[in-house]
From Swiss-Prot:
UniProt-recorded name of the protein: Uncharacterized transporter YflA
Subcellular location: Cell membrane
Membrane spanning stretches: 15-35, 66-86, 89-109, 147-167, 179-199, 210-230, 237-257, 303-323, 353-373, 386-406, 410-430
GO molecular function: amino acid:sodium symporter activity
Gene3D superfamilies listed in its UniProt record: Amino acid/polyamine transporter I (1.20.1740.10)
UniProt cross-references to PANTHER family, sorted A to Z: AGSS FAMILY TRANSPORTER, SODIUM-ALANINE, TRANSCRIPTIONAL REGULATOR, LRP FAMILY
Similarity annotation: Belongs to the alanine or glycine:cation symporter (AGCS) (TC 2.A.25) family.
Organismal lineage: Bacteria, Bacillati, Bacillota, Bacilli, Bacillales
Length: 471
């Protein structure tokens, strides 16, 4: 069994190296070109239609508000990858990995935008009156390939079990180390609290994440901003360190062993993609339930999600780790996951360590909450509502098993399982790219949407190119 797990881990490491990085990066570039670089052409408009519309009555039909859909999607992306994944990228790829993480985030916006657009376009209303959608629906309805939609759903249901076990292990260990709780009891308590939320369905999850996500993300980014203000003189040095190491091999410094340019690019791309989940098909499940008058309008919210997750939260972690100097510590490479805690302790003493532990708990708990919802929707798609109720308890049990230590042997299994949801989803995105472009063109050339919004604010419109209009 041990040899099998080692074999699986080697395969996972290889797949999450060049193969998937090339696939996802290529897809991001393709959609960026296809949609004429919309994320660069309409940044202010996108911001006004998302963050700028908070507090206004949503347009169109849906189950949850656009903000609740975003916070639900962010709950599954803002987590351990932001706190422990970024230091790992720095230790194994060097400071320059941060640049490549930023770069891939810009192209990943086009992937997540396209996922959400298709999810809303092909969504359905279930027996309870809730809007449901995601890859399983746009694969089945858009491509008329139900077998592939079923494959995606089954793969996601299976993948979420080790994912939840790993997350359950992370939060229980954090509570045990910080507050001396028993790990198993901590797992049971977390499972109970999460159960109270997920049993209430998408509306309750939306209400909880709408409160928790802005609070926890704001607190973490706020702490990072405070450190920036305490170290304003270090800001130019931070950017210099990142850019000077982005295009050359990084030399060894202290506990940092150095990194070849290829490793710098690989770690930056991999951590960026892993953090924002572009191409994985999970976030569109949340966005499909949003109240909106057009799929493209909800797609803008997924773009903002990457801004918050990668460009703000991950950058906050990167600055703190690099500015504090902990990445050059004697034994830094032995445990990159501990660098964020060490960096906060560098500035705030023991209180900084408690802050990171509490942040990690909130991040992980909200992640588990939402991924259980994703699994429930897959079970309902395959077998109906009763199966959705059953799978909730399977996932809640996985939290407790993970808390007991059962997750340690399946990290490789988790990464391998992710491949089986990424590949069919990306294939579907590419095959449905003409539909994405048609919806994009419709939104930006119709008098009902973009042109109407621009006239209200008396802004000069930015029209799609002739090629887009004629598509």
């Amino acid at each position: 069994m041990e040899r099998l797990l080692v074999w699986i881990e080697h395969i996972s490491d290889w797949l999450w190296g060049p193969p998937l990085i090339i696939l996802l990066t290529g897809t991001g570039l393709y959609f960026t070109i296809l949609l004429k670089g919309f994320q660069f052409r309409y940044p202010l408009y996108i911001f006004k239609q998302t963050i700028g519309s908070v507090g206004k009555k949503p347009k169109g039909e849906g189950t949850v508000t656009p903000l609740q859909a975003l916070t639900s999607a962010l709950s599954s992306t803002i987590g351990a990858a932001n706190i422990v994944g970024v230091p790992a990228a720095i230790m194994f790829g060097g400071p320059g990995a941060v640049f490549w993480m930023w770069l891939i985030a810009l192209f990943a916006m086009a992937i997540k935008f396209s996922e959400s657009v298709l999810a809303v376009h092909y969504r359905e209303k279930n027996e309870q009156g809730e809007y449901v959608g995601g890859p399983m629906y746009y694969i089945t309805k858009g491509l008329r390939m139900k077998w592939l939609g079923v494959f995606f759903s089954v793969a996601l249901i299976v993948e979420l079990i080790p994912s939840i076990m790993v997350q359950g292990n992370s939060v229980s260990v954090s509570l045990a180390e910080t507050f001396s709780f028993n790990k198993i009891y901590a797992g049971i308590g977390i499972a109970f609290l999460i159960g109270l939320v997920v049993i209430g369905g998408v509306k309750r999850i939306g209400k909880v994440t709408e409160f928790v996500v802005p609070l926890m993300a704001g607190a973490y980014a706020g702490a990072g901003l405070l450190i920036v203000l305490m170290n304003l003189s270090s800001v130019p040095a931070f950017f210099s360190l990142v850019f000077s190491n982005a295009f050359t091999s990084s030399s060894a410094v202290g506990g940092f062993a150095g990194a070849a340019l290829a490793e710098t690019v690989r770690w930056g791309f991999a951590r960026g993609l892993y953090s924002n989940e572009a191409g994985m098909g999970t976030a569109p499940i949340a966005h499909a339930a949003a109240m909106t008058d057009h799929p493209v309008r909800q797609g803008f919210w997924s773009v903002i999600g990457i801004v918050i997750d990668t460009l703000i939260i991950c950058t906050t972690t990167a600055f703190i780790v690099l500015a504090s100097g902990v990445w050059t510590g004697k034994n830094a490479s032995n445990d990159p996951a501990a660098l964020t805690t060490a960096a906060f302790q560098h500035y705030f003493g023991s209180g900084g360590g408690y802050f990171v532990s509490v942040s990690l708990v909130f991040f992980v708990v909200s992640t588990i909450m939402v991924v259980i919802f994703y699994g429930v929707k897959q079970a309902e798609f395959l077998f109906g509502r009763l199966a959705g109720h059953v799978i909730k308890f399977v996932y809640l049990a996985a939290i407790i098993i993970g808390a007991a230590g059962g997750a340690k042997a399946i990290w490789g299994v988790l990464d391998l399982a992710l491949v089986f949801i990424v590949v069919p989803n990306v294939i579907a995105l590419l095959l449905l790219s003409r539909k994405v472009k048609a919806l994009y063109t419709e939104f930006f050339t119709s008098e009902q949407y973009y042109l109407k919004d621009i006239r209200k604010t008396k802004q000069k419109p930015v029209y799609p190119t002739k090629e887009a209009k004629n598509s």
